Amino acid sequence: MSTVNELVNRVDETYDVLQIEKEIVLDNIALSDLELLATGGYSPLTGFLRKKDYDSVVETLRLANGSVWSIPITLPVTEEVAETLKVGEEVKLVNGGNVYGVIQIEDIFVPDKEKEALLVYKTTDEAHPGVKKLYERPNVYVGGAIVLTKRFENNPFPSYHLDPIETREEFKKRGWKTVVGFQTRNPVHRAHEYIQKSALEIVDGLFLNPLVGETKSDDIPADVRMESYEVLLQNYYPKDRVFLSVFPAAMRYAGPREAIFHALVRKNFGCTHFIVGRDHAGVGDYYGTYEAQEIFTNFTVEELGITPLFFEHSFYCTKCEAMASTKTCPHGKEDHVILSGTKVRELLRNGEIPPSTFSRKEVVEVLIKGLKKEVVTE
């Protein structure tokens, strides 16, 4: 189902940028968005949202043409920069002194950020990391089609940094007709492993696609997480049934809306199914435990182009002596060891070793070593 949708391709490294004088400096979020727009990760988007699409996405979770899209992908600039720009111009997109692309300006507009916060994040509380970032970024949005004119050279995980066209090819090569995507920003603990393997029972392959773009400061660093995924896959997963590749986007922490966004993006990478667990892409207590699953009832599988797989919170049951969920285990809470990425992070930062019911010992070793290194460099 998923590979039917056509991928946008806005990469052109021969594009002449020398004649273009004006430039917009991209922050890290806009830079990662530029790449994903150009390589088709954000298909059907061809650029940063214009006003009519932006308004439509914020209000209805759809583009102006009715296609499902739940997160506004925007290019914010300061009022000073906006005053120098005109609709119809072509402007360079730069970061760290390098020109990475161009935007053909179709729209310059001032968004209602409070409305965006309320509708996208369901809160205007600046303690929410997504809202905080929204308010910190400049106040004018520039919309228009983009071209990526230079690929990033400093990808921290080059062998795992694949474009959607490459992951699709990889799945095809492996003969996978059905592929389930799993999004994570945490090391994989036993609850994740249980969910992934349950899903793997009904599809041909698992696409483990950890997010390595900008996350909040107390999330475990991407390089440590990547090493933990490698050691886990090496020791506990069948090599011919799992594929690991990074998702270079920034984390929005938009809960339900981000769950839809993550599913649509994984469709572009070639997945037919997508795992949605408890509090997907949530943070703190801003969203209900299963709100990110309930939002999918607003859309048909046909219009999403990917099938969501919903999983309840899983735990280790000391009576069952196995991983389980309330769907499969009759025992009370007193017999359940509740696992979460937050809990694992907490234990590790306090110098405690999570028990084997929490995380595989090989993974724990990697995390302890990684966090010690982090403390030293701080």
Curated annotation (Swiss-Prot):
It comes from the Bacteria. It catalyses: sulfate + ATP + H(+) = adenosine 5'-phosphosulfate + diphosphate. Its EC number is 2.7.7.4. The keyword Nucleotide-binding applies. InterPro entries: ATP-Sase_PUA-like_dom, PUA-like_sf, Rossmann-like_a/b/a_fold, SO4_adenylyltransferase_pro, Sulfurylase_cat_dom, Sulphate_adenylyltransferase. It is an enzyme of class 2 (transferase). GO terms for biological process: hydrogen sulfide biosynthetic process; sulfate assimilation. One of its GO terms (molecular function) is sulfate adenylyltransferase (ATP) activity. Pathway: Sulfur metabolism; hydrogen sulfide biosynthesis; sulfite from sulfate: step 1/3. Keywords: ATP-binding, Nucleotide-binding, Nucleotidyltransferase, Transferase. Belongs to the sulfate adenylyltransferase family. PANTHER family: PTHR43509, SULFATE ADENYLYLTRANSFERASE (PTHR43509:SF1). This is Sulfate adenylyltransferase. It comes from Bacillus thuringiensis subsp. konkukian (strain 97-27).
